[in-house]
Amino acid sequence: MPELATREFWKDLQPIPDCFKPDAKPEVYLRNAPTEDERLYVPFTETVKSRPLWISPSENRWCDILMATSAGLVNRHYHPHEVFAYTISGKWGYLEHDWTATAGDFVYETPGEGHTLVAYEHEQPMRAFFIVKGPLVWLDEKGNADGI
């Protein structure tokens, strides 16, 4: 347990013994995952960086924080599987949709939807947490697959 409970109603509750079953994989705990420390990010495009948080080759899934400190672009692409996004700060959206995400907004992307991610100029950097399954397929100007 990270710290002892004092007044919480559950303070006398004991942890599960042997909580990691034989088929359990290691968990990940990252303090301050959406940090603005750019040393922890890798270039995703010329204007957007990614902080990988978790990658599972066996499940073909990953989680990351995308960040753009000024106007940014992740060019046309689609995901053959669903994607979940939660906006931490800043402002972003898809050119193909009529919404703009700001801090606290949640987005569910349906499988196979093509889009162009744009980050807007804002007083705070655009930071969004993404959960992705499968590849990201780049598209040309007409929406046809152009690479993985």
List PLM regions with ranges.
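A short, N-terminal "cap"/entry segment at the start of jelly-roll beta-barrel domains
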Residues: 1-60, 144-147
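Residues that flank catalytic or metal-binding motifs in active/ligand-binding sites
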Residues: 49, 81-83, 124
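Conserved hydrophobic/aromatic beta-strand scaffold that supports enzyme active sites
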Residues: 50-52, 63-65, 84, 106-108, ...
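Short histidine-centered beta-strand/loop micro-motifs
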Residues: 55, 64-66, 74-79, 96-99, ...
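Short acidic-glycine-tyrosine-enriched beta hairpin
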Residues: 57, 93-116
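"Short basic amphipathic alpha-helical interaction patches in structured regions
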Residues: 67-68, 80-81, 98-107, 144-146
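Glycine- and acidic-residue-biased ligand/ion/polar-headgroup-sensing regions
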Residues: 69-71, 79-96
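Double-stranded beta-helix
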Residues: 120-148
